Amino acid sequence: MSELVAGPHTRAPLSLPTLMRQVLLAAAPATAFGVWLYGWPALNLLLITLVTVLVAEAACLRAAGRPVRSGLGDSSALVAGWILAMSLPPWAPWWIGVIGGLLAVVLGKGVFGGTGQNLFNPAMVARVALLIAFPVEMTRWVEPAPLGSAVAPGFLESLGITFTGTADWDAVTGATTLDATRTAVTEGQSIETALPEAYQPALALLGYAPGSLAEGSALLLALGGVYLIYRRVIAWEIPAVMLATLAVLATVFHTLDPTRYADAGVHILAGSTLLAAFFIATDPTTSPTTTVGRAVFAAGCAVIVWVVRTYGGYPEATAFAVLLMNAFTPLIDHWIRPRVYGRTRLGAPLSTDREGP
């Protein structure tokens, strides 16, 4: 008679709330730097977005008949709102944060059934929808105005910027590095002549340049990503393959024609490349489950980013790239499957014959 034994199982070392809080902890330094760099309006936008996602998540949980306290306690909505706020223009009006927060929770999560059921990254769903619906507000980049500096708006002035839009935009806005490269290509100019004014590697590494609220500091984002890998919150394959693929593509084409194609440093340090590689594309719900699948997913993201930045109508492409590859995740998981316990990688059952003593 066969002996009944329990099936093999294991328990994850980190719970969902713990994982989400680790992500928030890793994103906090880059976010704090962005708030310092762009002043009170950036903090206003961050808080508005976070409050909106929490209220929207509570409403969705109540409508679905699920416990509100435990649903909010997993911090998944907070992470979605935080990542969304990091990717928004720092002086965007209050309603951008409200609409974006609602889209992230309702359209990005709620319609799919809630946490763990969504096909697309909620923050990027909101960001792309906002970019399509409100292109002016979503592409208005301000020059750095650090807190405490002579050019920084005071607290009361920041309320006017956030809630009434009373800012002299021509005096405070500037072009991002990717905007400058895109404009140069469109006007038939050489990228090599346009970049020195818009791109300085040292400043790009620190994040002292026009851009989204917390996408600029390459150094802090990379440190946060390394921390998440060390804590085993994210898999290393996605950021490693995504950054390597993008660097190889950029290097090859820049070598062929440096006047037409930006180099790897521009593609890696400018825009939201590092934010996407470490904090967005690594979302376990919307990325493949296998090591090979994650590598394919990351390479696809990198190729789309490079193609759209180089030939497309948008200078920044990470949100589009992540959403497109999110759509391919079920197909990747279908064709690239993990080995089933008790079977070979080809699917044949493992032999159960045992040699006698």
Curated annotation (Swiss-Prot):
Signal peptide: none annotated. One of its GO terms (cellular component) is plasma membrane. The keyword Membrane applies. The keyword DNA-binding does not apply. Belongs to the NqrB/RnfD family. It is found in: Cell inner membrane. This is Ion-translocating oxidoreductase complex subunit D. Keywords: Cell inner membrane, Cell membrane, Electron transport, Flavoprotein, FMN, Membrane, Phosphoprotein, Translocase, Transmembrane, Transmembrane helix, Transport. InterPro entries: NqrB/RnfD, RnfD_bac. The gene is rnfD. The lineage of its organism: Bacteria, Pseudomonadati, Pseudomonadota, Gammaproteobacteria, Chromatiales. It is a multi-pass membrane protein. Part of a membrane-bound complex that couples electron transfer with translocation of ions across the membrane. Its EC number is 7.-.-.-. The complex is composed of six subunits: RnfA, RnfB, RnfC, RnfD, RnfE and RnfG. The modification FMN phosphoryl threonine is found at residue 176. The chain crosses the membrane at residues 35-55, 88-108, 119-139, 209-229, 233-253, 261-281, 295-315, 316-336. Its cofactor is FMN. It comes from Halorhodospira halophila (strain DSM 244 / SL1). Its main location: membrane. One of its GO terms (biological process) is electron transport chain.
